[in-house]
Amino acid sequence: MAEPHQEFDVTEDHAGTYGLGDRKDQGGYTMLQDQEGDTDAGLKESPLQTPAEDGSEEPGSETSDAKSTPTAEDVTAPLVDERAPGEQAAAQPHMEIPXGTTAEEAGIGDTPSLEDEAAGHVTQEPESGKVVREGFLGEPGPPGLSHQLVSGMPGAPLLPEGPREATRQPSGIGPEDTEGGRHAPELLKHQLLGDLHQEGPPLKGAGGKERPGSKEEVDEDRDVDESSPQDSPPSKVSPAQDGWPPQAAAREATSIPGFPAEGAIPLPVDFLSKVSTEIPASEPDRPSAGGAEGQDAPPEFTFHVEITPNVQKEQAHSEEHLRRAAFPGAPGEGPEAQGPSLGEDAKEADLPEPSEKQPAAAPRGKPISRVPQLKARMVSKSKDGTGSDDKKAKTSTRSSAKTLKNRPCLSPKHPTPGSSDPLIQPSSPAVCPEPPSSPKYVSSVTPRTGSSGAKEMKLKGADGKTKIATPRGAAPPGQKGQANATRIPAKTPPAPKTPPSSGEPPKSGDRSGYSSPGSPGTPGSRSRTPSLPTPPTREPKKVAVVRTPPKSPSSAKSRLQTAPVPMPDLKNVKSKIGSTENLKHQPGGGKVQIINKKLDLSNVQSKCGSKDNIKHVPGGGSVQIVYKPVDLSKVTSKCGSLGNIHHKPGGGQVEVKSEKLDFKDRVQSKIGSLDNITHVPGGGHKKIETHKLTFRENAKAKTDHGAEIVYKSPVVSGDTSPRHLSNVSSTGSIDMVDSPQLATLADEVSASLAKQGL
């Protein structure tokens, strides 16, 4: 669930600044959610801060717990810090909240508490980052603020964040990482751890612890918030109480590596080693924190380091920006990466590094109630870590447990007895995530009553454990307030879904549903609003969480549960076409019987007597064809053809002989034409020669009148041999004198030629 919010408004929410985006899938989260997210962040830290020596219950823890629970909803509707990072900084003016001041009283954790949870623990998780940032900005709410405020608080003994945190961190961070960190937080934690190792100095101080812690807690808190936003409340309470940015406090620790804060009892190095061993990634930062913060700081650092690796990258920027923007000491926080923070160092000197304080105050394994711290952290979470914690809690309950463990150390800023109780919840390593959820709610509401808040936190811690086992939704009720926290513990354990809805109605009020991320400024403002308003607001948040309930098992179940649909009563069903009669029909045809009855034809009579053949069996199987040759011996033919009776037609033996008849030899023509039998018609071999007669040309009149007749006849081929007439001269001239008949002959010839067409 953290992932949805992760991408919500990391840019807006200083995700880049806090590394929230890198941290627990909060890349998209808005650090602006700090206002509301601070509650989660603070809540997350609150569990860590639970081991506050103050013994004062950290209402923040319970509230944070409650807040953490809404993480599902927050994740669903991550509250973008309803203000831009700058707005948050402005909204979270640098203000040091008295150690006894409740997160709500400080007015830092109010809005974030339930609203952040309801609106979206995503916001709360981002608010974890915001917690640091708001701590820098002076928002007590930021988880980082919680730790650092606790650390920075002179009167606030360092929560045995080292011990508790070490103790928790092994179980809380381990589980949180395992549960919340397992999701994105653990990777982010390792990344953050790498960053923290790189930026170890910043993490070292309370600021380093907180900043890294806040960022890392924001990461881890997001895990915690995702798993159980309870962790954040302590952080929030712490910021509320101390009023100094968790990162500032962390930085104080960072800048003053060895000193445990005035009232803080430095945790032994063992805690750091313990935490380091348990939390490899977070441990490196924590050792740095431990160096800065002393032995007490390391446990706290462990938690913070766990959160800070990615956060530190973004936190370095975000913290610096927030601190510089909101707090004069913010720059010191910004340098958290650098390690010492001017403002935080001063604070560290001034305040007994609440985180260190608490670690010293509470044994490693002993949870310290820090209701005020939880409140501060709630505020921080609401403002800075709500989204982050919310997301974290959603992402992994273990993560939130870790955050709570570490944040209790941060929570020390509220050294009130209430502050110790929140830690007490987280004190159980396994339970840390759970107490954080319940502390969250306490943080927002209970910060005012530290002792009762712590107690409620404890109750919630017990419930929180159950809650942590259950969805975060259970934790959100704690955020409502001490009363809510107390109620919420019962509510939360039975039905995580109900706590978000009942405990988080304030959330929805503040966050006004998931829409509040849309207006980052508003949730933050509400978050920073007086602590008292926060519980009611958180209840609205819970309403927002009510939206989350779907995420929580109870809500999911209730939503998923649909009235059983009764099976249709088929007995009363009537079919228009009577099909119900065959309702039980089982097709298959297996029982079909084919009855073959033979017809009795004995009485049948045929019209045409065919009955006689009724028994006839066609087929001719028994038909016999008898071939009897006909005896023709006695047959006589009418015309004596009997003689040819054996004649075989076909003429097989007939031979056709063709003989040419020599009719020329045998035939004689009647008229003696035989003589001309060889006659070739047309004169066969004879040539017909035509000679052109030129007599006309040469003819002369009978009477020689002296005129010569000129006659031109067509040229006749010379092929033909001219027949020379006796009376025709070679020249063709006719000697009329010699042939008196020539004239007549010539005329005849001319006539014949003319006929022939010559």
Curated annotation (Swiss-Prot):
Q: What is its main location?
A: cytoplasm
Compositionally biased region (Acidic residues): 217-228
Q: How does it sit in the membrane?
A: Peripheral membrane protein
PTM-bearing positions, type N6-acetyllysine: K480, K542, K576, K598, K607, K615, K628, K634, K638, K648, K660, K664, K686, K702
> Pro residues bias located where?
491-503
Q: Self-association or partners: how does it assemble?
A: Interacts with MARK1, MARK2, MARK3 and MARK4. Interacts with SQSTM1 when polyubiquitinated. Interacts with PSMC2 through SQSTM1. Interacts with FKBP4. Binds to CSNK1D. Interacts with SGK1. Interacts with EPM2A; the interaction dephosphorylates MAPT at Ser-396. Interacts with PIN1. Interacts with LRRK2. Interacts with LRP1, leading to endocytosis; this interaction is reduced in the presence of LRPAP1/RAP.
State what this protein does.
Answer: Promotes microtubule assembly and stability, and might be involved in the establishment and maintenance of neuronal polarity. The C-terminus binds axonal microtubules while the N-terminus binds neural plasma membrane components, suggesting that tau functions as a linker protein between both. Axonal polarity is predetermined by tau localization (in the neuronal cell) in the domain of the cell body defined by the centrosome. The short isoforms allow plasticity of the cytoskeleton whereas the longer isoforms may preferentially play a role in its stabilization.
This chain belongs to which protein, by name?
Microtubule-associated protein tau
| Organism per entry | Pongo pygmaeus
Gene from which this protein is expressed: MAPT
